[in-house]
């Protein structure tokens, strides 16, 4: 608050700072203060790019500012759910931090008070969720934790494998769910032809 354009998130034992410009001396001093207050292992900064291409995505990987570096991949927890993240994967770390409220809504099966995500009749049995453009399946894991059988679609096999690891981190069997590699819009047409239906589409 009071620092427009500068975002700081705690990611496990690390702080992740994000802005569209390099850190100023005052910002670095504030990060040092926060690191001491929260017993942080290391602090990273990521330069935000509005429309990053492949080269820019790699260059925009979070850079260590001070402290100990993170391992290539490590697990963090949010609302009791574990996710694998990485500061070495380019522009994104494997979890969209600004979607935490939506992940919480999936976990609770409620969009808001009096607005259930699925009909009450389905709460105590499996319901079907489709996660198009699934990335590393963060939403899929939350839906599965909430009792859904989840179909996840992504154009990247690597990210779908990452998603399966997220399922395993949460003691969820990936074999009980479906992971579809390919173009999401093409898969939607195929699923429609197969008369597949879902209670929730993400």
Regions picked out by a protein language model, each given a short descriptive name:
Residues 58-148, 161-162:
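Glycine-rich adenosyl-nucleotide cofactor-binding module
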Residues 2-9, 25-97:
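Non-catalytic substrate-recognition/targeting regions of SAM-dependent transferases
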Residues 40, 126, 197-199:
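Local beta-strand N-terminus motif with an aromatic residue
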Residues 158-200:
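S-adenosyl-L-methionine
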Residues 55-56, 142, 189-192:
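Short, well-ordered secondary-structure micro-motifs
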Residues 149-154:
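Conserved SAM-binding motif I beta-strand of class I
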Residues 43, 129, 201:
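Receiver (REC) domain switch-region micro-motif
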